[in-house]
Amino acid sequence: MNIETIDHIGIRVADLDRAMTFYELFGFKVIHKADNDPVAVVKNDEGVELNLVFNANDDNGGDNILMDIPTKYAGFTHVAFRVNSVLETVNILNANGIAITQGPVKFGREGHVSV
């Protein structure tokens, strides 16, 4: 398995606008935010990318498949690795007793795949 880099880190937030403003203090710029989209993508000049996911409270009703607990709280949800081959990575994980519980699922931009 060849991990090329960390692609991004997902963070659940209770207030998307407040979170975007907070990360702007650290030099992050919003590179993706669509109307009615509960995700904002921010990136700094060094290339660190964060996915800010707004559905950190039960009142919003949003499910996040990337958190395998029933109650959703603000905080870390996932780290995404960029690999040279998703199929090879899945095969290596399976061969080492690591179960893939979902996917691969294509989503988002630039051919992202979730497992």
PLM features: what roles do these ranges have?
Residues 1-17, 76-79:
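N-terminal beta-strand motif that seeds the catalytic metal site of vicinal oxygen chelate
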Residues 4, 37, 74, 110-112:
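Loop/turn position at the start of each blade in beta-propeller repeats
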Residues 11-51, 55-57, 95, 111:
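Core segments of cupin and vicinal oxygen chelate
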Residues 15-17, 84-87:
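Helix N-cap motif at beta-to-alpha junctions
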Residues 22, 87-92:
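Short amphipathic alpha-helices within nucleic acid-binding modules
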Residues 41, 81, 90-115:
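Vicinal oxygen chelate
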Residues 54-68:
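Short, flexible, mixed-charge acidic loops at enzyme active sites
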Residues 66-77:
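Helix-adjacent hinge/juxtasegments
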